[in-house]
Amino acid sequence: MEAAQAFENLANLEQEFGKAEIEILKKQNELFQPLFEQRRDILKTINNFWVVVLEAAGDEISQYITPEDSVLLEKLENIYVERFNEKEPRDVRISLTFQPNEYLQDDNLTLVKEVRIKEEKAKDDEGLEKKITKYTSQPVDIHWKPGKSLFRKNKKLPPNFFDYFQWTGEEEDDDFDGATLTIFLAEDLFPNAVKYFTEAMTEEASDEDESVDLEEDEEEEDEEDEEGDEEKQEPPSKKSKKSN
């Protein structure tokens, strides 16, 4: 009985921790949002910033991206995340803005996905009541150009990046893990975008330096080989005849 009470007390305490984390997130959002707005204005001056960031994100993003997706994502101009609900700061609005392209109608270059937190009560294996947190959303109506829709046409095919905009989180057979992608975009990729970009640029510069060093080494080896060949080809000097 004492053990059961202890587990119940721990469960209640975990709920209090959860409430505290939400209060921290509220304060963090209050402080960060003006800074993110300033950053957005600065990033407009850096070509392909978000394209580089997505490439640097690795499997967290690339697992969803098909070759066709990547063609459109090359036109990505901006990603922005807003926590629009003061009472529930985990609710997010994720916006992706594109340059004019062959896929999207010109009146629909910004795709907006709102994701909300939904808490439901359930019981665990021991019969104790607990709260389950779900991420839910509404499908986004994307205006594709004729014949250019990137939504998968068959549910048997693996999901791709743009299927995220059709994900709802409500269907039990939904095979797209939109909750995980939402958390990654909102809590990792967006706030740490400059870090991803800087690391990618540093790695690229390092690769270029290594390439230059390798080319210089090859040039030096070629020069040494040429000098060696010249020495081998040089004829021996003739001895002068003695006069009688």
UniProtKB/Swiss-Prot annotation:
GO terms for cellular component: CENP-A containing chromatin; chromatin; chromosome, centromeric region; nucleoplasm; nucleus. Pfam families: NAP. Residues 201-232 have a biased composition (Acidic residues). It is found in: Nucleus. Keywords: Nucleus, Phosphoprotein. Residues 199-244 are annotated as: Disordered. The modification Phosphoserine is found at S211. Signal peptide: none annotated. Its main location: nucleus. GO terms for biological process: CENP-A eviction from euchromatin; nucleosome assembly. Belongs to the nucleosome assembly protein (NAP) family. This is Putative nucleosome assembly protein C36B7.08c. It comes from Schizosaccharomyces pombe (strain 972 / ATCC 24843).
